[in-house]
Amino acid sequence: MQTRNTFSWIKEEITRSISVSLMIYIITGASISNAYPIFAQQGYENPREATGRIVCANCHLANKPVDIEVPQAVLPDTVFEAVVRIPYDMQLKQVLANGKKGALNVGAVLILPEGFELAPPDRISPEMKEKIGNLSFQNYRPTKKNILVIGPVPGKKYSEITFPILSPDPASNKDAHFLKYPIYVGGNRGRGQIYPDGNKSNNTVYNATATGIISKIIRKEKGGYEITITDALDGHQVVDIIPPGPELLVSEGESIKLDQPLTINPNVGGFGQGDAEIVLQDPLRVQGLLFFLASIVFAQIFLVLKKKQFEKVQVSEMNF
């Protein structure tokens, strides 16, 4: 009986350990793989601040370019492409969460006017589906269908992202109007430097937290360093922890000042934002314009014919 209880206890402990390990793996894996949109979605109700700044810039500190291309004008209830380009040197490698080097991922947030939204699959043409590839877009919030996020996705394959967008129809949507609208975009390549809680990632520079002499540098077994800084006046010691990834700039015995860089800046990525304008065009206005242009063409043709007729009359009178 005692043996059976012992085996039962061991079985429960093993099961509990496996469950905890799986939970940790899932949580950490999710936080790494879904870092870009998840951090913004969890921390901010709206990704664009009142100043016009997109909140991704709070974690991705380096400024890099991004480009967006949309049609100049679209008709109501029409599917069109919004192409976001996130350029970078494909040969670059970034510091991963485990300190190793790897390829860069990219991510983007697209802020559309109210009423514009992600096109349903049955409205997307085969040609557009081919451009989209295996990308999966999601709404920033269930109630904010006009704000779309994507990423992280492999940068080598998706440095150009095609969003399939459906324009609103003012005939059925009273909040939509035939106007010129702004579109905002933010795009990043690579990991961020700061987490939303304010802590640094291992993809940034680490500075000294005290002035003194570096008395000891210990390289950790799993990577990273412990740097002991000793105050030359009172002997007080401060230990700075460097995670795996950044390379050291300092050595033992070196004098150092407060906020002096201890490591290089390993970041090779960055964030950029841009904007574009699009006109929701009234079909009746287009028809009116076409009618006006057609009337001008016909008027020109009529004048040419009248001129030729007049010339013929003049020639006949001269011959007479």
Swiss-Prot record:
Binding positions for heme per the UniProt entry: 36, 56, 59-60
Example GO BP: photosynthesis
Q: Where are the transmembrane segments?
A: 286-306
Please give the positions of the paired cysteines in each disulfide bond: none
Which keywords accompany this UniProt record? Chloroplast, Electron transport, Heme, Iron, Membrane, Metal-binding, Photosynthesis, Plastid, Signal, Thylakoid, Transmembrane, Transmembrane helix, Transport
Molecular function in Gene Ontology? electron transfer activity; heme binding; iron ion binding
The entry sums up its family as follows: Belongs to the cytochrome f family.
> What is the protein name for this chain?
Cytochrome f
Its taxonomic path starts at: Eukaryota, Viridiplantae, Streptophyta, Embryophyta, Tracheophyta
Q: Which gene encodes it?
A: petA
